[in-house]
């Protein structure tokens, strides 16, 4: 096996498995809560929409941490790599504290932005107040995972996720349905299970992080001062990612609000497809993570031709994988929607939405690899910010509103039209990739 394939598999496979586990984490929640009816499914889905904003913002911090750590490890500069981790860690704690306060104190007001259904808001507020406390452990574990992946210890976050899913599944069964003497808590039980599983995930990653540091003979450094770059450079790098990811997630929330106003059945149909969409994207997300680390290390060593060649090979692998998985999803979509105890019409809408998603999946995956891994690895994050803003707010959102309120289409038509913005992203990203101006060494 070539060195390229060894490095790719060492990073991509654990990250892929971890992403799939995290997506299955959502599927377990959805299927179990789905037994409680459409109101609870919708409530959890809307809470997830707000949590998505947190996830992408903290993911932006983790992305910058990964860019810096990968490049400086490639350049054999341990001190700068630790500084990248420490600064990102502080940013993550501040952001998670803000989201904790917002979702813990104002759950009903936040949910009211998505739906006017009082029952959904009431159920969602109970769920929201509990999962708000999971934001801090999620932030810490996400940033520590960036370090572990760059050091090619991606198996540790995967094992942590595996354990967390097992904990979540077991506690869901006990607390949602009141088995083995536990109280029957419904949606509240699902929230408690989620919180405990995230605490388990954090504990596992922290132990693994300490073990790996000792194994490598590294010394933990607390440093908030860069030497190769300035703090201003860090802010210039992270700000476009924060802006683009926040606006993208806000756009997702606007789209969800539109879905919510299409009616409870349409919202339920879309919500039940979200976990499987996350599972499919997660199945190929390892390639994006591997691209960021592998290409970043090449750039850190100023091996520009090697970085370009590796980027193309990863993109080819992503295309083949996406087409294969999409074909399987089209064949199995009906089986998945059949797992839910909802009306037949909701199942059929969900099945059609999954087929539409499968047709767009290869484009989505290539965008994920290019925008989320390759182009960002050079540190010039402004390019992706512009693509994201134009794609979401100048194309996706207007098409969504046009389809829903002018054409008055249903959920399938609205979703199909707005997803065409992925094609714009891919065309522009490919043009930028071929020009090679994104290939910058920070060392």
Where are these regions (language model features)?
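Short alpha-helical transmembrane segments in multi-pass integral membrane proteins
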Residues: 1-15, 69-136, 182-239, 295-360, ...
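N-terminal transmembrane alpha-helices
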Residues: 3-31, 35-36, 52-68, 93-100, ...
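Transmembrane helical elements of multi-pass membrane transporters/channels
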Residues: 10-29, 130, 164, 197-201, ...
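Transmembrane alpha-helix boundary and packing residues in multipass membrane permease domains
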Residues: 15, 19, 30-31, 48, ...
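Residue-level hotspots within pore-lining transmembrane alpha-helices
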Residues: 17, 21, 25, 54-58, ...
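Helix-terminus/linker motif at the lipid-water interface of multi-pass membrane proteins
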Residues: 20, 24-42, 111-118, 174-185, ...
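Small-residue-rich hydrophobic transmembrane alpha-helices
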Residues: 41-101, 138-157, 267-333, 365-389
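Short runs within selected transmembrane alpha-helices of multi-pass transporters and secretion channels
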Residues: 62, 131-150, 157-168, 190-206, ...
């Amino acid at each position: 096996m070539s060195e390229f394939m060894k490095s790719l598999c060492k990073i991509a496979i654990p990250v892929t498995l971890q992403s799939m586990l995290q997506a299955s984490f959502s599927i377990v929640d959805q299927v179990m809560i789905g037994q409680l009816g459409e109101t609870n499914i919708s409530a959890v889905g809307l809470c997830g929409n707000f949590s998505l904003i947190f996830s992408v913002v903290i993911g932006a911090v983790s992305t910058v941490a990964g860019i810096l750590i990968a490049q400086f490890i490639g350049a054999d500069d341990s001190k700068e790599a630790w500084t990248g981790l420490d600064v990102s860690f502080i940013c993550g704690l501040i952001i998670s504290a803000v989201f904790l306060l917002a979702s813990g104190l104002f759950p009903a007001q936040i949910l009211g932005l998505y739906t006017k259904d009082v029952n959904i808001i009431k159920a969602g507020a109970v769920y929201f107040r509990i999962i708000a406390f999971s934001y801090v452990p999620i932030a810490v574990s996400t940033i520590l995972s960036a370090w572990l992946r760059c050091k090619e210890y991606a198996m540790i976050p995967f094992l942590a996720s595996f354990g967390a899913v097992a904990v979540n599944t077991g506690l869901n069964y006990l607390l949602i349905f009141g088995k083995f003497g536990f109280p029957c808590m419904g949606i509240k039980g699902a929230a408690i299970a989620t919180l405990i599983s995230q605490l388990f995930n954090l504990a596992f990653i922290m132990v693994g992080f300490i073990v790996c540091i000792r194994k490598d003979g590294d010394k933990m450094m607390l440093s908030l001062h860069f030497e190769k770059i300035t703090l201003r450079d860090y802010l210039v790098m992270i700000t476009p990612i924060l802006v683009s990811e926040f606006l993208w997630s806000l756009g997702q929330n606007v789209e969800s609000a539109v879905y919510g106003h299409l009616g409870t059945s349409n919202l339920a149909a879309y919500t039940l497809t979200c976990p499987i969409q996350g599972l499919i994207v997660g199945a190929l997300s390892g390639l994006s993570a591997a691209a960021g680390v592998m290409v970043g290390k090449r750039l850190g060593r100023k091996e520009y031709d090697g970085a370009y060649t590796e980027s193309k090979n990863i993109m080819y692998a992503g295309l083949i994988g996406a087409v294969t998985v999409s074909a399987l999803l089209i064949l199995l979509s009906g089986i998945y929607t059949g797992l839910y105890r909802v009306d037949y019409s909701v199942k059929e809408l969900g099945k059609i939405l999954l087929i539409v998603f499968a047709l767009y999946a290869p484009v989505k995956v290539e965008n994920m690899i290019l925008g989320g891994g390759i182009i960002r690895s050079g540190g010039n994050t402004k390019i992706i910010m512009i693509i994201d803003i134009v794609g979401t707010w100048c194309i996706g959102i207007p098409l969504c509103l046009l389809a829903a309120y002018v054409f008055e289409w249903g959920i399938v038509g609205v979703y199909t039209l707005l997803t065409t913005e992925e094609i714009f992203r891919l065309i522009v990203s490919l043009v930028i990739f071929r020009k090679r101006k994104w290939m910058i060494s920070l060392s």
